């Protein structure tokens, strides 16, 4: 028995258990990837991730559930937060995005006026045409976004509750989300050409037409 006491104890390795740790790591990695791909949605409004997704009807969220709200006097403020996650922006919080270049857009309010800035950096919506002051540049960095005005300042809200572009740097108060209600293209799960999908007979027909 003395010989047995000198034997170094070790964990019993059973068949099929050896790669358990690796499998758990794979599952964790897949779960993290899935979380990254998960859409940030409020109602049917999803948060854009790049400039190419900005088009059509959009809303600009300044704080959780609180959107830029157009007033009938041509000014803008931050609307009351929508507490329900399924509640999207109201009509005064919806704008039409018009691409002007590979990095700039114009934004048109529901009152038919383009958003711009005055000489003091106050965001106003009183223009019937797009000029230099009605151009905006969404800036993306490490998963966050800010909106740069033509005066090279970022959009935020001042103490009076007015929307302004007066900050040369983008802090937490200048972080935004642009939400779109456009229908998203379904993500492809494979690289199989469309003509290769379907049964054999259908594939033959597809290639005949090709």
Curated annotation (Swiss-Prot):
MF (Gene Ontology): actin filament binding; RNA binding
Region described as Disordered: spans on this chain: 1-37
Protein's UniProt keywords contain RNA-binding: yes
Subcellular location, principal: nucleus
Biased composition (Basic residues): 17-30
The keyword Manganese is assigned to this record: no
Cited InterPro entries: Actin-crosslinking, FRG1
Top-level lineage group: Eukaryota
One biological process term in Gene Ontology: RNA splicing
GO CC terms: Cajal body; catalytic step 2 spliceosome; nucleolus; striated muscle dense body; Z disc
Region forming the signal peptide: none
Motif Nuclear localization signal in this chain: 22-30
Keywords from the UniProt entry: Actin-binding, Cytoplasm, mRNA processing, mRNA splicing, Myogenesis, Nucleus, Ribosome biogenesis, RNA-binding, rRNA processing
Family that this chain belongs to: Belongs to the FRG1 family.
Summary of subunit composition and partner proteins: Homodimer and homotetramer in solution.
Purpose of the protein: Binds to mRNA in a sequence-independent manner. May play a role in regulation of pre-mRNA splicing or in the assembly of rRNA into ribosomal subunits. May be involved in mRNA transport. May be involved in epigenetic regulation of muscle differentiation through regulation of activity of the histone-lysine N-methyltransferase KMT5B.
Protein's recorded name: Protein FRG1
